[in-house]
UniProtKB/Swiss-Prot annotation:
One of its GO terms (molecular function) is small ribosomal subunit rRNA binding. This is Small ribosomal subunit protein bS6. The keyword Ribosomal protein applies. Pfam families: Ribosomal_S6. Belongs to the bacterial ribosomal protein bS6 family. One of its GO terms (biological process) is translation. Binds together with bS18 to 16S ribosomal RNA. One of its GO terms (cellular component) is cytosolic small ribosomal subunit. Keywords: Ribonucleoprotein, Ribosomal protein, RNA-binding, rRNA-binding.
Amino acid sequence: MRKFETLLLLSPELSAENREGVVSTFTGIIEREKGVMEEVDNWGMRDLAYPVRKLMRGYYVRLVYQGPAPLVAELERNIRMTDGVFKFVTVKLADEVAGEVA
C-alpha cells in the first residue's frame, strides 16, 4: 500500500452539513476501494491569493490515507464530478507503507 495526501479546496458557499457530506463521501470511497484513512484535517476558511470562480475565500480539507494506486484514480474521478469542489491536488507521500490488512 502507498500513502497519499489529497488537499481539497471547497466552495465557501457550502453549508457545514454539505461540507461534512462531501468529506464523508470521499472517505467512504477510500474505504470502499480498500484504502485506510489516516487523517482528515479541516484547515477551515482561508483567503485565496487570486479569485477562483469569482470568489476570494475557500474551505480547505486535507485527507491522508493509504491504499493501492487505482484508488487515487477513482477518488479523483469522483472529486471532479462533485459540485462545490473548486480545486484539488493529490501527492504520493510514500511507497510501500506497511498498512493494516483487512
